Every structure is written in C-alpha cells, then in structure tokens.
UniProtKB/Swiss-Prot annotation:
Record-given protein name: GMP reductase
Keyword NADP set for record: yes
InterPro entries, alphabetized: Aldolase_TIM, GMP_reductase, GuaC_type_2, IMP_DH/GMP_Rdtase_CS, IMP_DH_GMPRt
UniProtKB keywords: NADP, Oxidoreductase
Catalysed transformations (reactions): IMP + NH4(+) + NADP(+) = GMP + NADPH + 2 H(+)
Source organism: Latilactobacillus sakei subsp. sakei (strain 23K) (Lactobacillus sakei subsp. sakei)
EC numbers: 1.7.1.7
Protein's job: Catalyzes the irreversible NADPH-dependent deamination of GMP to IMP. It functions in the conversion of nucleobase, nucleoside and nucleotide derivatives of G to A nucleotides, and in maintaining the intracellular balance of A and G nucleotides.
Family annotation (Pfam families): IMPDH
GO biological process: purine nucleotide metabolic process
Binding site for NADP(+): 203-226
Amino acid sequence: MDVFDYEDVQLIPNKCIVKSRSEIDTTVRFGSETFKIPVVPANMQTIIDEPLAIWLAENHYFYVMHRFQPEKRPAFIKMMHERNLFASISVGVKDDEFDFINQLAQDNLIPEYITIDIAHGHSQVVIDMIQHIKKVLPKSFVIAGNVGTPEAVRDLERAGADATKVGIGPGKVCITKIKTGFGTGGWQLGALRWCAKAATKPIIADGGIRTNGDIAKSIRFGANMVMIGSLFAGHTESPGELVEEDGQQFKEYFGSASEFQKGTHQNVEGKRILVPYKGSISDTLTEMRQDLQSSISYAGGKRLSALRKVDYVLVRHSIFNGDML
C-alpha cells in the first residue's frame, strides 16, 4: 500500500483541448441533486448554520447541516422544503437518534440527505443506524462515516449506505491522531485511494484539504465529493465568532470533538484556532470553481472525469520547495 498525502503528489498535465476554462463543466450529480462543484463545507458549528445552508442550496451547492442542535432539525427540514430546497441533516447513533428517525417518518418529514456523523464510523451501531434509516426512510440518501479502510467502506455499503465519508483525524482542528495514535492524518490521500478502490458507491474525502489544488487531487484518487473545513472558516457568512487581535480580524474555528463544541473536557479530539477573516464565501466558492476548471484543463478534458485518468508523481513533501503555506 502506498502511503502519501496531498503535499506529496503532483498531477502530470495532458494536452489541453479547450480554448477557455469557461468551456469546462465542474458539476457533479450526487444523490438526487446536481451541484456546481464537488465540494461541501464541513458539517461543523463554526462552518455551517441555517442561513448559510439556505444560501448554499439556493445557489446549487451541497451542504450538510451539523447535528449539534438536534431539537431544531425537524423545523429545519420543514423550512427547507417550504422553500423548495433540499434538506440535508446529520444524525448521531445514540438511542434517541433512532427514535428521531422514527418521528421523521411519522411526521412525513423526509430529508433528501442524512449523514451519520461519528468519528469512528466502522462500528456496529453505525451499521444498525444505516439499516434503520433505510427501513424507515428509504428515500433518503444516506452518507455514513467516518472511515479509513476498505473493509469499513465495504461493510457500510453492504449495510445500505449510499455514500461513505473517508477521513479519520486529518483535519486542521482534529487531534485524533495525536490523542489516540489512530487515523489517516499524514496519509489521507493514500487512505482515500485505498478506500476508493473498494467502493462501488460515491466516496466523500473528508479532511486534510489545504489548497484548492487538493480538490483536484481528491477527485483523481477516487472522491466524488470533497468535504472541507478550514478553507470555509473565517467568512462573513461563517457562524464562528468574530474576534479582533492586534488590529486584525479573525473568526474562531473548532473541531466537532473539541471542548469548545462539547462544553466539557471529556474525550476531547479537537482544538480551537483563529482563522483570518476572509470576506464573502461566494468569492471563495467562485475561486474554487475556477481553479477546478483550470485543473480539468491541465488534465486534458472538459469534465471532472478527466481528472481520474491523469498520471501523477510522488515528490515527498517538496512541492512547496520549503515555502510555508
């Protein structure tokens, strides 16, 4: 098994066949919807909230609402449907979450997407939840995770998952690899490749994305969608608190298993950082799309599928030539 990460890889260009990158199509079909780019903001409290979810859906971007205000989820689904928008929620795996799924069916509140969101997704309780959702809400598209092995992907797909989320602790504010000794931190791209080879359904690469070029690399190694936290932190629309230090504006960004999210210092696997204020998220998404169009032009194609066929080289941490990002 090859072990490498995003900074270890450079994709090799093919002959360009377009006159302008505006000819290039970056759209992706995922579940029942088609989205402008294969990118989704992480379902974290400092990344996504209701106003941003509405904006993303209205503008044909995928989103996954976080699960940290569970009592608001039924009203959120209803509100999105009243706006003729898709509803995409997260659930955990505790007993009351099984009851919650039953209640949604009873109330005929059927979200288009349900993400089962726990740190170690290769577990029997996740399999039980997948099977429960598929039995009670068969029309919902079920995303399960997070995982880091082919065995996990196969098990969750067999249970009925429509997509799996790959990545255990590679994110900027996740310290699972430090606290537990386990995870895909430092070799996330290799883990993605390993898992994608076993997958028969879509894969979401989750974590470790530091640059827009990493999106293209994720597609090359098997991702259908790329979940990103840090690049989406710090915007006007980001729910994180705006703070000022030494005359510079920042927004806070913390992991889903941090004490800042949990409100307690038990089983902490996340940390809090301050991200420089970045302005509008619309500008960031536009730049991502344009950079992805350029990536596809270098791949010699007009669609995302061209990225899957390019050759690559391993350069072992040298692509930045010693420069820090």
